[in-house]
Amino acid sequence: PNNMAIILAGDIDPDKTIDLIKKNFGEYKNKEVPKFTFEPEAEITEPIETTVVGPDAEWVSIGYRLPGVKNEDTYILPLVSSLLYNYQAGLIDLNLVKDQKVLSANAYDDVSYDYSTFQLSANPRDGQTLEEARDLLLSQIEKLKTGDFEDWMLPAAIKNFKLQDQQRNLYNSYRAYKMTNAFILEQNWADVVEENDKMSKVTKQQIVDFANKYFKNNYVVVYKKHGEANNPKVEKPQITKVDLNRDTAS
């Protein structure tokens, strides 16, 4: 029980719920939990590129590795993601998708314990190379780094982020998810609750500083090209024939 959590959200009777938990889990005994340690990954100092081939449509994806949830800057990452892409008025939405410079594009973040990730992806237009689509994505990162975005975009991104969080909080499943995530990431629940207020105070200069600090030539690019996949084949094993006694009854 010292390495698990029972997450409940909804219209519950606290006293009855506690009784049920004690009845079903009360005899669990504490055990020593070994502390997990890991070797930090080597720093990426130049772009790493790889190509995969398959029959599906072509795309390009760019990934950055960022600090984990305990880092003092990580709370800004979801806001950076929303500034770039929020389905309506992010830099990628306005400059690439609505201007039809690529067929489609997006960006998203994933905050985890040891490291977080940030990823941008695009599907090229007909006649457009994956390298051209890649450069268009990177150009939007550069706009963050130079502060080349309208002043209204940051307050709008903050309001949009808070609105989405409020709407999702109407559902028990989302509230349970937030508590589960906080438990897994070892976050103080008070910090999770105050995250929106903290995010509301982020300035444009903080966005610029964040982008310059973490978005350098330290990314990985995957080019998905159209073609016949040349995947290694597993040799088919010899199958032993099984004699069936169809006329035998037991």
Segments (PLM) and residue ranges:
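Active/ligand-binding-proximal structured segments within catalytic/core domains
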Residues: I62, E72-L84, I92-L94
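Short, solvent-exposed loop/turn segments at the edges of secondary structure
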Residues: P1-N2, E43-E46, G54-W59, T74-Y75, ...
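Secretory-pathway/luminal and periplasmic proteins that interact with or process carbohydrate-rich
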Residues: E27-P34, A89, L163-Y171
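Short amphipathic alpha-helical signal-transduction/dimerization elements
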Residues: F25, L84-Q88, L138-K145
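Proteolytic maturation boundary segments
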Residues: A5, D13-V53, W59, L94, ...
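Solvent-exposed, non-transmembrane alpha-helical starts
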Residues: D19, K70-T74, T129-R134, P232-K233
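M16 family metallopeptidases and their MPP-like homologs
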Residues: N3-A9, E58-G68, L94-S200, V220-K225
